[in-house]
Amino acid sequence: MVRRRKGRVIHGVILLDKPTGISSNDALQKVKRLYGAEKAGHTGALDPLATGMLPICLGEATKFSQFLLDSDKRYRVIAKLGERTDTSDSDGQVVQTRPVHVDYDTLLACIAKFRGETDQVPSMFSALKYQGRPLYEYARQGIEVPREARKITVYEIELHRFEGDEVEMEVHCSKGTYIRTIVDDLGEMLGCGAHVTMLRRVGVANYPYERMVTLEQLNALVEQAHRDEKAVADVLDPLLLPMDTAVEALPEVNVIPELMTLIQHGQAVQVSGAPSDGMVRITGGEQKLFLGVGEIDDNGKVAPKRLVVYGE
């Protein structure tokens, strides 16, 4: 018996500008429903408080979402000095209030200490799991559980504004970096406490900021399509970026048509000019059809790891 599909087959990446106040999964489900997509997944959750770039992979692009999850991120953040909360952001309860006696030079010096590789202990209010449950579930019950410090890298952290008790910064960091934790640590370093009042992700990997679209824009396009008696796909699909943009940081290996079939059947092949090791992005023929991702094996061959299945 042929399984009935629960959506249409559509492949690509849409850069959603997530609004504040909803979870990343809620945003994902709204986009999936608007596109009528059979399969969809996001590439790293944003806090409900946070806004900004949330790449959503549709169809076969979901196979490559991990590469975006592992990529560098950029954030704009506004912190309020003088108040520490139990969640390190304005969604939490204020647990400590202290006077703010911070000058510009001291603030700059403290911010500079976050640059480079450091060990960061994740917040209890995070989606990381302990014994199968998200940490925030324990935190809401007042239970603190052990968390291992993780290596993170802050490539750049810049002070954009310091007015009264507000500090605005931009942070370029590695995957797994908790901006709330940076702000909480900064507040303790300054001796006054701090928490996040605004957090916006402005970059994931090399995706262009200007290609982001909001849920309001998507809904408006769908409504206009209905009024004009057009197919929703005709107005929404042009917003999708090609699925190989999720892995564009990987070196490309182009295989001749004769080798494409072997690759698509999971066989490792020898390709002249391929790197000596590491992961690669595999394309085929003169058209450079994206075939998937492979890895250079011990014999120097390109071994396919995740392949695109085209068609229905």
Curated annotation (Swiss-Prot):
Reaction catalysis annotation: uridine(55) in tRNA = pseudouridine(55) in tRNA
Record Gene3D superfamilies: Pseudouridine synthase, PUA domain
GO biological process: mRNA pseudouridine synthesis; tRNA pseudouridine synthesis
Organism: Vibrio cholerae serotype O1 (strain ATCC 39541 / Classical Ogawa 395 / O395)
Main enzyme class: isomerase
Protein name (Swiss-Prot/TrEMBL): tRNA pseudouridine synthase B
Gene that encodes the chain: truB
Family: Belongs to the pseudouridine synthase TruB family. Type 1 subfamily.
GO molecular function: RNA binding; tRNA pseudouridine(55) synthase activity
